[in-house]
């Protein structure tokens, strides 16, 4: 059963393959009739027909069709958060086995899966039920994904529907030719060992069915949220990080900015890329762009360092005061860390709500071999965008030196992580 408040919008792209208003009639007897030149029978005048001359006319191209699919309770919550945050240029879907949860979903398009199996009562925390429900509704899922160029699948791993159904949704999306990106969370430790074990199984199943998989470790959020944060608020933080992962990629495709990126650029980096890491940083002040970049690549959300990444998509967003020099400073900071031959795609977007601040989202792919543990964030004015400002004790791996204390505020310059300092030899 498909609950779609905008049914006609769902199939619009699949039914409009041509460009309306730009018809082209071809006369088989004269192959030059549609070339823009008039080779008529008038021997007195060999003029170019102005009426038929289409040189210089721009034919509008088709905008990339982006769909965000929230699977299960966690995925649905993330979609709700995206809608509340006015994420634009994408089509939202909520997919669930729980009919009651779907009625409360904010997505305009909703799909209940596994009606015969679950009778709308959910998967009971059992991923096997979630998988069977998705298999039962495979055709309906394909209809929902029809016409998509880029599909984001967001879910909270560890439960029943999200863990079991998300890999099937991804499989269908890939079969239909869409660039498929999974953005999922790994559960908090306090959610229990069973849920953690189920999450790992779901992640493995999803990893082989998507082009790129971004995993957000919820437990890492404990390093950046206050100790007094209620449980419900902690889960809202996790939902918002999922939102930022999707928006960081979709914005650079859908929103015209200082530096425009098209869908083909993003596909070049993310197609068949495997596991990916995501970092987010925000900063203000004189060196805000560089500090935000360092915060992003040193983010507590990173389970390991992005050093050596061979594919990077990053988005720098700022107010109307964002300068090209700041964009360059952020880009150079990231260039210093990744593989010298990395394929790097970045966009710069203006958001007037960020006056005085710069926000950077980094998605890194293409890792080989062992990846070292990520260093902690140390930029003095930088922070993770999803959390209020809070400094936590810095843990420096592979060293016996005592934990560093915060630098005095008067000190000039930037406290740069060790791995960045090692990667900054004199330029040739």
Curated annotation (Swiss-Prot):
GO terms for cellular component: cell division site; cytoplasm. Residues 392-402 have a biased composition (Polar residues). Keywords: Cell cycle, Cell division, Cytoplasm, GTP-binding, Nucleotide-binding, Septation. One of its GO terms (molecular function) is GTP binding. It holds the Pfam family FtsZ_C. It is found in: Cytoplasm. GTP binds at residues 73-77, 160-162, 191, 195, 239. SMART domains: Tubulin, Tubulin_C. SUPFAM superfamilies: Tubulin C-terminal domain-like, Tubulin nucleotide-binding domain-like. Its main location: cytoplasm. The keyword Cell cycle applies. The keyword Lipoprotein does not apply. Residues 378-428 are annotated as: Disordered. Gene3D superfamilies: Tubulin/FtsZ, C-terminal domain, Tubulin/FtsZ, GTPase domain. GO terms for biological process: division septum assembly; FtsZ-dependent cytokinesis; protein polymerization. Belongs to the FtsZ family. Homodimer. Polymerizes to form a dynamic ring structure in a strictly GTP-dependent manner. Interacts directly with several other division proteins. Essential cell division protein that forms a contractile ring structure (Z ring) at the future cell division site. The regulation of the ring assembly controls the timing and the location of cell division. One of the functions of the FtsZ ring is to recruit other cell division proteins to the septum to produce a new cell wall between the dividing cells. Binds GTP and shows GTPase activity. This is Cell division protein FtsZ. It comes from Nostoc sp. (strain PCC 7120 / SAG 25.82 / UTEX 2576).
């Amino acid at each position: 059963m498909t609950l779609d408040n905008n049914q006609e919008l769902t199939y619009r792209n699949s039914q409009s393959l041509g460009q309306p208003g730009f018809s082209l009639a071809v006369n088989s007897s004269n192959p030059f009739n549609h070339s823009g030149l008039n080779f008529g029978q008038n021997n007195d005048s060999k003029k170019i027909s102005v009426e038929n001359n289409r040189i210089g006319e721009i034919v509008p191209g088709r905008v990339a069709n982006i769909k965000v699919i929230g699977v299960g309770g966690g995925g649905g919550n993330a979609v709700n958060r995206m809608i509340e945050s006015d994420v634009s240029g994408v089509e939202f879907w909520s997919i669930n086995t729980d009919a009651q949860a779907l009625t409360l979903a904010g997505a305009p398009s909703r799909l209940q899966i596994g009606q015969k199996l679950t009778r709308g009562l959910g998967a009971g925390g059992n991923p096997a039920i979630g998988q069977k429900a998705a298999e039962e509704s495979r055709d309906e899922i394909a209809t929902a994904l029809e016409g998509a160029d880029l599909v984001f699948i967001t879910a909270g791993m560890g439960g029943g529907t999200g863990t079991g159904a998300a890999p099937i949704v991804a499989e269908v999306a890939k079969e239909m030719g869409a660039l498929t990106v999974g953005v999922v969370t790994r559960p908090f430790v306090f959610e229990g060992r069973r849920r953690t074990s189920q999450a790992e199984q779901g992640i493995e199943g999803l990893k082989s069915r998507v082009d790129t998989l971004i995993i957000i470790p919820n437990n890492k959020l404990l390093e950046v949220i206050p100790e007094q944060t209620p449980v419900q608020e902690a889960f809202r933080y996790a939902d918002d990080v999922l939102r930022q992962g999707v928006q960081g990629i979709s914005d650079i495709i859908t929103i015209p900015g200082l530096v425009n990126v098209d869908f083909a650029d993003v596909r070049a980096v993310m197609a068949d890329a495997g596991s990916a890491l995501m970092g987010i940083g925000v900063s203000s002040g004189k060196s805000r762009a560089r500090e935000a970049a360092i915060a992003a690549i040193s983010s507590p959300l990173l389970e390991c360092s992005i050093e050596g990444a061979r594919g990077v998509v990053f988005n720098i967003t700022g107010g109307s005061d964002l300068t090209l020099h700041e964009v360059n400073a952020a880009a150079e900071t990231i260039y210093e860390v990744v593989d010298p031959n990395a394929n790097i795609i970045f966009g710069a977007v203006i958001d007037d709500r960020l006056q005085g601040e710069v926000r950077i989202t980094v998605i890194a792919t293409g890792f080989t071999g062992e990846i070292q543990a990520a260093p902690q964030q140390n930029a003095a004015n930088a922070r993770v965008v999803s959390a209020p400002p809070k400094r936590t004790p810095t843990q420096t791996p592979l060293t016996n030196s005592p934990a560093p204390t915060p630098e005095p505020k008067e000190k000039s310059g930037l406290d740069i992580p060790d791995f960045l300092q090692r990667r900054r030899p004199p330029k040739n």
